[in-house]
Amino acid sequence: MSANLMMITLRLIHLIFGAFWVGGAVSVAFFILPAQRAIGQPGMLFVRQLMMGQKFRSYMIGAAVLTILSGLTMYIRYVMAGGGWAQTNTAKILGVGALAAIIAAGIGTGYTGKIGKRMLELGGQIQASGGPPTDAQKAEMGSLQGKMQSAFRIVAILLLLTVAAMASARYL
């Protein structure tokens, strides 16, 4: 594969999967999770189906991995080409954007995964009891939902900062 074709392929992977990742994170953080909290139990069932049944979480993780790996590969190829590119403002700004994306991926896969697992466990306990949730279960679920929404907002903001860095890097 020629160098140009390789870079075009990497760039397409980076842009397409990055757009999906950012759009998904922003949608979940600012629209889906707030709506889920507002409507209560039916909203929780919807989010569970979205994340587990429709495998949205898996697709988001896959998009994050492909976006980061393709971006790092392009970055390394530019650095290896020499010419002092790594010392330019463009390279530094792209590096900051990459770091923000990597942090977002860590929060989005690690921290939210732990919260989601506990939410599923608690939901299963509530369902198995056959009755309404106890006050303690309601309080814990509310706390978990708040943490999940906050984490997704942080992820979304980090990814929007990443997009801003990527879009402006060559002009600064």
Model-derived regions, located:
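Polytopic transmembrane helical bundles with strong interfacial aromatic enrichment
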Residues: 1-172
